[in-house]
């Protein structure tokens, strides 16, 4: 029998294709070229692997022969050799040629070797060194560990095993077996201590997003580690049985709330079925995944191009997921699994990212290049340039605008052409963009007036939507003067959510409220828009049962902004018009409380002055604001304030705010404004604004 196997094995070796790189067949392994390994009892191999694998799959003939002869260990050994030499699938997200590892990835790999310090995104025992928390307890691993005051996100991400891929890269680069030994020890421990729940998904280890992430990583881990002497037939059987169980779980439990998690789940299933076709259920995994992706690209991307969760962070993520699914299908001759019009919604979705990228993206070394509305945070220019826009150009090579974004970012040499400066209205999502150019010195105002939909219908603290309809960000000449407060932290069930609540507070955004109470409804409605020398957008939201906020924004000669805000309804109490400024010292961001406004005095002469006027007496109330650029519980302080008015039930609160960008000192700037209509009208408003001696009459009629 052994001699027959030797002849067959040599023939297979001679006629099989090349592995991913030349050393794949020359390193590692535990098979002597002349002999099979010493026999081991059947019970060292998980017998379920032979139930999960399709023994009739081409290339598994020896596996089937050994299995039917009752030689389970030799069958598993033949299966391992099959995986080491197979060339029947292609993972476009993985290359084993000249693998490199970053300093950050190396640190994650090494920290995991000592006291089980497992990397969990944005959670560190020492933020300076990015040292992870240790989950070691009584000599073992406590998979239920969560640092003090950490949000639910820690437990969720712990079970995504974010340090495994760095360890795999470290192994591939160094050849040091300690990395695979750590992986096997830890993953085996995880399997033993986190069995699949009998009742379906839980909120931590077996939540759909965690399972999806693990599946996506495991197809890579197999390739990185498979030639190690420590990757034994016994371990392969354990690994494959667990892989099949997790993929089957995703088929059985589609994420009911849809959104980005369902897309991640579908992508994982498509990946599992495509790259692991040897499993009996591979076709089911693949078909389920591609079917969901085909449906959800239409269901979740609205007609204006926005993803229904209306968070730019998740929007960018789902476009990347759809792109990866498309590339996976193409690389494995499975494009027919996706509809021919699969990319049509993705074009608009890619253009959303383009229009929501601030022009400092084109400055070499600049960060914080996108707005942070809802559960979203700033993104570095390198991620957009080297990953996202690169993918968009690959999908849409005919787009000269996307080509410009991909090439000109981070100080690059521009190709293609700049997008136009027209007002962009994303009415389905409730976002409106006003701009005067695409150079770093340009001005861009983005306004948020979201409306609920079937994927984003809650303003509860755990949702990705913040109760901030009417808010805005304003970028000018390299500086975001009114950045969103950010997220800071995710929700914690039954825990301390003070930071989560604070950053979601409506007065921590640039909009109107009553008594600083969060709105109850997100039902943004676009009422009017006009283009021309002076651009206009008018929108409203019935955020409370008895109070509606209407905001009209005039972009006067594309030089300065006039905001007309009205609190409409029979609500009575204190109306708060809130403004949250950029970071700066007290001498750089200066409150002008007596003038109901603020001005900046930055040394680079890039400044603004803000003044608010009203239809009755108001007071200016400064407070210490906050801004968070990540979701790690950390934040910086900044200057914020509210313009407060006491409103009776029969009154409409009316404000005029002028925001004037200034090149130099604001000392000589003069601003005044007043209403020139006869009072609140359901269909119109008219104001007179004087800026530096020049008077402008601004009005709209619905």
From Swiss-Prot:
Catalytic activity field: Elimination of sulfate, appears to act on linkages between N-acetyl-D-glucosamine and uronate. Product is an unsaturated sugar
First-level EC class: lyase
Subcellular location: Periplasm
EC identifiers of the protein: 4.2.2.8
Keywords of this entry: Lyase, Periplasm, Signal
Signal peptide positions on this chain: 1-17
Pfam family, one: Hepar_II_III_C
Gene3D superfamilies xrefs: 2.70.98.70, Chondroitin AC/alginate lyase
GO cellular component: periplasmic space
Active-site residues, as the UniProt record annotates them: 314 (proton acceptor)
Protein's job: Specifically cleaves heparan sulfate-rich regions of acidic polysaccharides. Does not act on N,O-desulfated glucosamine or N-acetyl-O-sulfated glucosamine linkages. Functions in cleaving metazoan heparan sulfate and providing carbon, nitrogen and sulfate sources for microorganisms.
Protein family: Belongs to the polysaccharide lyase 12 family.
Protein name (Swiss-Prot/TrEMBL): Heparin-sulfate lyase
Species of the source: Bacteroides thetaiotaomicron (strain ATCC 29148 / DSM 2079 / JCM 5827 / CCUG 10774 / NCTC 10582 / VPI-5482 / E50)
